[in-house]
Amino acid sequence: MNYIFSGIFLYFFLCFLLYIFQRRIVFNKSGHPGAPKDYNLANTEEVYIKTEDNLKLLSWYHKGNNSLPLLVYFHGNSFHIGDRAYRIQKYIEKNWSVLLVSWRGFGGNEGNPTEKNLYKDAEAVLKWIKNNTEFKFKELVIYGESLVSGDAVEMGTK
């Protein structure tokens, strides 16, 4: 009988811990990525995307051939943009334009990542593309990994 009560107690204790630490589990932040040259990303520059609540989000931009699409890549949870450099390397080699976006709270960026705030970040990315590139929204390829795949889908509907 003690085993049953111990098992029930352990179950509820684990549920309690999951509840308490759910934000850390879902929004597992990462450190600063370094510079694009550290990842052999040729002709890729650091850009800062300003959000409506005045945060500056570090992102990397490679300007390629304007006749090819712009790949907008949103990294997933527990990563920063440097961790995903290998995934965009092939597009840069084919001379695509690439914007590798880092979210608030990730990659050394300030801010608190929440679902609402990640949507704000996606809106800021759209505005940055409109104001700083020649691409039209129909020429974008939007890739959202893991945590931010929903934000990428939302961005694609705009």
Regions found by a protein language model. Give the residues of each.
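Aromatic pocket-lining residues of Rossmann-like dinucleotide-binding sites
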Residues: 91, 155-156
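A generic structural signal for alpha->beta connector loops
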Residues: 43, 54, 95, 137-139
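Solvent-exposed polar/charged
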Residues: 19, 157-158
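An N-terminal hydrophobic leader/cap segment in hydrolases
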Residues: 3-50
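Glycine-rich nucleophile elbow surrounding the catalytic serine of serine-hydrolase chemistry
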Residues: 144-154
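Membrane-embedded segments
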Residues: 52-132
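Alpha/beta-hydrolase fold nucleophile elbow
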Residues: 135-146
